[in-house]
Amino acid sequence: MKLLATVGLALCALGATTWSQAQAQAKLCDKPRQMDGFKTCADVEKAEAEGAFVLYSTDPEPGQAKLVGAFNKAFPKIKTTYFRLQAGALYAKILSERQAKSFLVDVIQISDMGMILDFQKKGGFTQYISPEMAAFKPEYKSKPEGYWTWGSVIMAGIAYNNKVTPEAEAPKTWEDLLNPKWIDAINVKVSNSGLQHGVWFMLKPLLGEDYFKKFATQKPRAFDSYVQQYGRLVDGQDKVIMGAQYSGAIEFTAKGAPIGFVFPDKGLPAVSETYGIVDGGPHPHAAQLFMDWFLSPVGQKALAEALALHSPRDDVPPPPGAVPLSKMKLLIPADWEAFEKDRPSFAKEWDRIVGARR
């Protein structure tokens, strides 16, 4: 399989007219400081004096705790805090906080590029060009550079319990999920999920407008987190996950769970988990230091170990036990503005499909 992704063609044009010429001309510091495994332009002493760092993220709490714990291990003087919600709810939270002039978070990660672009347009990010950004492809970074950067690539396939469903009987294609035998046996994510939106956005053109109308008759149940989804699969409450997050399968399989994962031939919808420093955050120096650490091979490996997520960096290996990006057929939106505009209609239709079945 080949990596199939014409990523972010619209990104080059986005944001350039939004920001002043002075902002666009921001550059890397003259003499980045060499740390243990990464370079930084942050004032490390000031970051440690701030003594704290706050991350908002869509990732499950146990993985977040491991990730910020690894940062805290590298910088023990900086106490780390995290908060987790699905993308839509998390974005609503930070917008509400900013409207109330309550600046509580230093770095935010959202798994929905439409929300990231909207936040950039609203001036929600502060520009900081990390020395580690040079290792990321242009399409994985904001224009101008320094407002946000892809921290990981997440992809969705089909998962099943291989103790309940033999491999020969498991669905092999997206169309197989329409088989009546899967009625009342499928779970998905709620409409607040950036990845679920990506599944919808990329599969509709491939499978036709009627696909999701037919899928609705399967009576899928929606859940907030892949932890819930895979937990129900392991317990036998559901038989299949449609749009199953691959990192969740890797995580549960590593724990000995009987999970089978299918890579449909037509491809795996994929989106990014994107990180940026929030403008007006309470610990700006710690935020810069975190971004430098996180975007480096050291931080990216910590992410892979904590959450089984794939790094966009070519020099970072995939999570243990995972297929590398180069071996996947990824379906990544090429027009993120269209993706952003599609969200309201997706949310309305997806909520109708799942109804109250949660």
Predicted features by range, described:
Residues 21-54, 72-73, 178-184:
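Immediate post-signal peptide segment of exported/extracytoplasmic ligand-binding proteins
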Residues 138, 153-154, 182-192, 213-216, 222-223, 294-317, ...:
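Periplasmic-binding protein-like
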Residues 159-164, 201-202, 271-283, 294, ...:
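A bilobed periplasmic-binding-protein/Venus flytrap-type ligand-binding module shared by bacterial periplasmic
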Residues 320-358:
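Extracellular/periplasmic bilobal clamshell ligand-binding domains
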Residues 54-69, 80-95, 103-237:
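Extracytoplasmic ligand-binding site segments that recognize negatively charged/polar headgroups
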Residues 114-118, 239-258, 307:
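A ligand-binding cleft/hinge motif common to bilobed small-molecule-binding domains
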